[in-house]
From Swiss-Prot:
The keyword Repeat applies. The gene is 9DC1. It comes from Solanum pimpinellifolium. Residues 760-812 are annotated as: C-cap/acidic domain. Belongs to the RLP family. Residues 1-21 form the signal peptide. This is Receptor-like protein 9DC1.
């Protein structure tokens, strides 16, 4: 009996210890709980603190505020993201990635009181440009440290090198981190246990050291400013699985010609935008584990390297932005190949026969090359294809039915080719982008396109598509870009096309045969940025509901039959940069309120070819704040920015330098005012001279009068000035000769007088710039100004001038001659009367008087 009691007692003690030990993880030390709560209170929780949160595979996950669950009533070991030692209860790991934290991370943070930490992940938060504290180097037991993408800035402290137990160090960020160049090599020297090192976008600005940990499996140094020749030892790290050296334009990479020590382990190799020294060696054939290879923008030239075709386990091969040439060889049987990009190699040519038998291919990009011929119609091995890009080649023929039958197709881009025939019905229900613009396609828009639940881009412009726009288009509730411009569509615009779509950003129905009114209601909260309806037969008024388009940057309603007064309320669209109402039936004076902010962001204002009357809208012209600044940027031309310009270029008619042309992209510096072909009257406001960024000014074919404002001399970058066919009087301001960028000048058919300015650009303008101004003189006209040399042609001499002995007869000479002639004449009279010949004398006297009088009149005109 005693033995039984003893057994039960021992069992009780054992169970008590077991329960006690299992409860230890919940016994968080009070000082550590307090430190965590103090750390929590240093930050706010902002759901927008970080938008992109990747998981370990790179896929986006949802961020959530882990610290909101922290409170005193529970043990810190149960808090979200906190992990404790099962024996001691000490906090040994803190996972706060993607926790929506926002605020300054102070160097004396209570976090540094958690001295037993082994793992610390603060990635994907927003610490608003905080410095990385040297105290991170005091976590002597730390094996994992992730501070990436949390908006840290400044120099990474050298104390990080004290963390000799680190296996994982991730500090990559685009916010402005750097390592002092001479600290990079010592940092690596002490971190001998590293398995993963990620310093992407950290400014290293140094050569690549060779003392990387021999245990490295991941080395990510993209965008770090590395330069010089990459040490070959990097390729011989025997455990290396992932090597990313991309976006180091001063880095030279020479691949080993013999078998690499990492050949069996290397799975990912990214060398995008580095310099590859030689051709791809045969040693690439030994990379039997390689799954992903990115060699875009590496100046590869010649035929596609054969060793790349031997990578039998490759899943993703990216050779875009190179100078590869010749036909694409027949693809081997890549059983695992899912992604292939040869985008923008320019000189890759030949047909597409190589496409067969790649059953796993999901994404194929052959855009921007010189491929020719039709797409083969007998391809049957691409049933897994999700994305197909063949744009900007020389492909022709009809689009084969197998493309429309792809069951999982998500994105299709066949634009900028010469495909013909009809667009067939799509089998896929998962389409998100269909781009078939700039081909020769005809027929109607297939119903299957209008019933997609995820379609975001539908770009069918510049084809020969006909018929009506079905109201079924309103089912596309996820649509962002809709471009049906430059087709033969007719009928009315469905009223619901905007009303039901809260995501629509670009609406382009220009250059069709659409009629009726714009009866769409633009609801409050819409995000439309571009509305282009020009070149149709639309009537009625400009919808007042457009005032709800707060993000609108371009509004082009030109070349229609709209009958309305000027929609002054459009001035409240403060994002508006381009406004074209040209060639309509708009009329009446342009009235404006006293609000000085109206139209302040406009860069292009085109109201030409309407029936506007009254004075020029001086107050609106004075509000054009953007035009009051000169774009002094240099280098590559910058265009009016648009977040979707990679997919879509708006087409709008621009009048500049005396010509109308359709522009698909508009320079950010291109500032234009075109008020021509209206009935404006009165004087030209001198306030236009304040618009110093103006490049083109056209006020022609109105009823303007008065003088050309001298303030125009301030328009120092003006390239085109057209004031023709008005009633402008006075002289051309001499100060206009200082406009050194002026290429086109038209002042014809006015009432200008005086001398034409001389010098610089004015010496290059011809007669047509000034014709129809009878009072103008000077070059290039035949009427010259005083002091200018005159060139007289024989055709300009009349009969009297030919009889002159000298073209320069002075008044003194005439008087002397007349006096002498008088004395002689009196003597002759005496003789004639004496000899009885009065008739002869009378005839001679009359002739002499006529000759002298004529010469005197001619010289009086000349002087």
């Amino acid at each position: 009996m005693g033995c039984v009691k003893l057994v039960f007692f021992m069992l009780y003690v054992f169970l008590f210890q077991l329960v006690s030990s299992s409860s230890l993880p919940h016994l968080c030390p009070e000082d550590q709980a307090l430190a965590l709560l103090q750390f929590k209170n240093m930050f706010t929780v902002n759901p927008n603190a970080f938008h992109y949160c990747p998981d370990i595979t790179g896929r986006e996950i949802q961020s959530y505020p882990r610290t909101l669950s922290w409170n005193k009533s529970t043990s810190c070991c149960s808090w979200d993201g906190v992990h404790c030692d099962e024996t001691t209860g000490q906090v040994i790991a803190l996972d706060l990635r993607c926790s929506q934290l926002q605020g300054k991370f102070h160097s004396n943070s209570s976090l540094f009181q958690l001295s037993n930490l082994k793992r610390l992940d603060l990635s994907n938060n927003n610490f608003i440009g905080s410095l990385i504290s040297p105290k991170f180097g005091e976590f002597s037991d730390l094996t994992h440290l992730d501070l990436s993408d949390s908006s840290f800035t400044g120099v990474i402290p050298s104390e990080i090198s004290h963390l000799s137990k680190l296996h994982v160090l991730l500090i990559g960020d685009q916010y402005g981190l750097s390592i002092v160049p001479h600290n990079f090599e010592p940092l690596l020297k002490n971190l001998t246990q590293l398995r993963e090192l990620n310093l992407y976008e950290v400014n290293l600005s140094s050569t690549v050291p060779s003392n990387f940990s021999s245990h490295l499996t991941t080395l990510q140094l993209s965008g770090t400013g590395l330069r010089g020749l990459l040490p070959e030892r990097v390729f011989h790290l025997s455990d290396l699985e992932f090597l990313d050296l991309s976006y180091n334009s001063q880095l030279m990479v020479r691949f080993p010609t013999t078998k690499w020590n990492s050949s069996a382990s290397l799975m990912k190799l990214y060398v995008h935008s580095v310099n590859i020294a030689d051709r791809i060696p045969e040693s690439f054939s030994h990379l039997t584990s390689l799954h992903e290879l990115d060699m875009g923008y590496t100046n590869l030239s010649g035929p596609i390297p054969k060793p790349l075709w031997n990578l039998t386990n490759i899943e993703s091969l990216d050779l875009r932005y190179n100078h590869l040439e010749g036909p694409i060889p027949q693809l081997p049987i890549f059983e695992k190949l899912k992604k292939l990009s040869l985008f923008r190699n320019d000189n890759l040519d030949g047909g597409l026969e190589f496409l067969s038998f790649n059953t796993q291919l999901e994404r194929l990009d052959l855009s921007s090359n010189s491929l020719t011929g039709p797409i083969p119609s007998n391809i049957s091995g691409l049933q897994n294809l999700e994305c197909l890009y063949l744009s900007s080649n020389h492909l022709n023929g009809s689009i084969p039915s197998w493309i429309f039958s792809l069951p999982s197709l998500v994105e299709l881009d066949l634009s900028n080719n010469t495909f013909s025939g009809k667009i067939q019905e799509f089998k896929s229900k998962t389409l998100s982008a269909v781009t078939l613009k700039q081909n020769k396609l005809k027929g109607r828009i297939p119903n299957s396109l209008l019933n997609q639940k995820n379609l975001q881009l539908l770009l069918l412009s510049h084809n020969n598509i006909s018929g009506h726009i079905s109201s079924a288009i309103c089912n596309l509730k996820t649509l962002i870009l809709l471009d049906l411009g430059s087709n033969n569509l007719e009928g009315t615009i469905p009223q619901c096309v905007v009303e039901r779509n809260e995501y629509l950003s670009h609406l382009d129905l220009s250059k069709n045969r659409l009629s009726g009114t714009i009866n769409t209601t633009f609801s409050v909260g819409n995000i439309l940025r571009v509305i282009s309806l020009h070149g149709n037969k639309l009537t009625g008024k400009v919808p007042r509901s457009m005032i709800n388009c707060k993000y609108l940057t371009l509004l082009d309603l030109g070349n229609n039959m709209l009958n309305d007064t000027f929609p002054n309320w459009l001035g409240y669209l403060f994002q508006l940069k381009i406004l074209s109402l040209r060639s309509n039936k708009l009329h009446g004076p342009i009235k404006s309120s006293g609000n000085t902010n109206l139209f302040m962001g406009l860069q292009i204002l085109d109201l030409s070819s309407n029936g506007f009357s009254g004075n020029l809208p001086e107050r609106i012209l004075g509000n054009l704040q953007t035009m009051k600044e000169i774009d002094e940027s240099t280098g590559f031309p910058e265009y009016i920015s648009d977040p979707y310009d990679i997919y879509y270029n708006y087409l709008t008619t621009i009048s500049t330098k005396g010509q109308d042309y359709d522009s698909v992209r508009i320079l950010d510096s291109n500032m234009i005012i075109n008020l021509s072909k209206n009935r404006f009257e009165g004087h030209i406001p001198s306030i236009i001279g304040d618009l110093v960024g103006l490049r083109t000014l056209n006020l022609s074919h109105n009823v303007l009068e008065g003088h050309i404002p001298a303030s125009f001399q301030n328009l120092s970058v003006l390239e085109s000035l057209d004031l023709s066919s008005n009633k402008i009087s006075g002289e051309i301001p001499q100060q206009l000769a200082s406009l050194t960028f002026l290429e086109v000048l038209n002042l014809s058919h006015n009432h200008l007088v005086g001398c034409i300015p001389k010098g610089k650009q004015f010496d290059s303008f011809g007669n047509t710039s000034y014709q129809g101004n009878d009072g103008l003189r000077g070059f290039p006209l035949s009427k010259l100004c005083g002091g200018e040399d005159q060139v007289t042609t024989p055709a300009e001499l009349d009969q009297e001038e030919e009889e002159e002995d000298s073209p320069m007869i002075s008044w003194q000479g005439v008087l002397v001659g007349y006096g002498c002639g008088l004395v002689i004449g009196l003597s002759v009279i005496y003789i004639m009367w004496s000899t009885q010949y009065p008739a002869w004398f009378s005839r001679m006297d009359l002739k002499l008087e006529h000759i002298i009088t004529t010469k005197m009149k001619k010289h009086k005109k000349r002087y």
